[in-house]
């Protein structure tokens, strides 16, 4: 059981890194050099929303990257628009610019292509549904475990 548990944890990490590689290769194919794969996923997680940096951090999983630094970079390169929050002038909100929305559309097209290829290999993607159930169960376990510690 211990070996299966450890293998699952390592596989989750490898899959995340592999997906970042997939995103990076798409950015390279599109000759986009002013943004990296993690920043692209930050944009994807923002989507059509307007968020504070704190909300963005809570929504995504960026493997310890500095979300504030990445947001500054994305604003400087025209992917995000940053505005003061109307209710609290100390807080800022970010939303995608037209350039950011265009990149998110390109990433969504990549994801659609991936889904199509996966569906050809295993029609219905039922194996992913089962995998997701297992991952949600593991996430709940770790969340409950951490809440018991504090």
Model-derived segments and spans:
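N-terminal leader segment of winged-helix/HTH proteins
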Residues: 1-33
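N-terminal positioning helix adjacent to the helix-turn-helix/winged-helix DNA-binding module
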Residues: 4, 37-39, 99, 127
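Short amphipathic alpha-helical segments with heptad-repeat character
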Residues: 6-9, 13, 17, 61, ...
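Generic structural concept
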Residues: 13-16, 43, 47-50, 97, ...
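Charged, amphipathic alpha-helical coiled-coil/dimerization segments
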Residues: 72-133
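C-terminal regulatory/oligomerization modules of transcriptional regulators
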Residues: 1, 125-150
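N-terminal helix-turn-helix DNA-binding core of bacterial DNA-binding proteins
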Residues: 22-63
């Amino acid at each position: 059981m211990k070996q299966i548990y450890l293998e699952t944890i390592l596989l989750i990490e490898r899959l995340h890194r592999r997906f970042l590689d997939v995103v990076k290769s798409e950015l390279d194919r599109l000759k986009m050099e002013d943004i990296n794969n993690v920043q692209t996923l930050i944009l994807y997680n923002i989507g059509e929303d307007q968020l504070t940096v704190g909300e963005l951090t809570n929504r995504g999983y960026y493997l310890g990257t500095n979300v504030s630094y990445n947001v500054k970079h994305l604003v400087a390169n025209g992917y995000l628009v940053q505005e003061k929050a109307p209710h609290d002038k100390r807080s800022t909100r970010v939303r995608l610019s037209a350039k950011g929305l265009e990149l998110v559309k390109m990433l969504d097209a990549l994801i659609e292509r991936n889904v199509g290829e996966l569906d050809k290999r295993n029609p219905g993607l039922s194996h992913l549904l089962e995998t997701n159930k297992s991952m949600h169960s593991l996430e709940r376990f770790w969340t409950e475990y951490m809440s018991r510690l504090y």
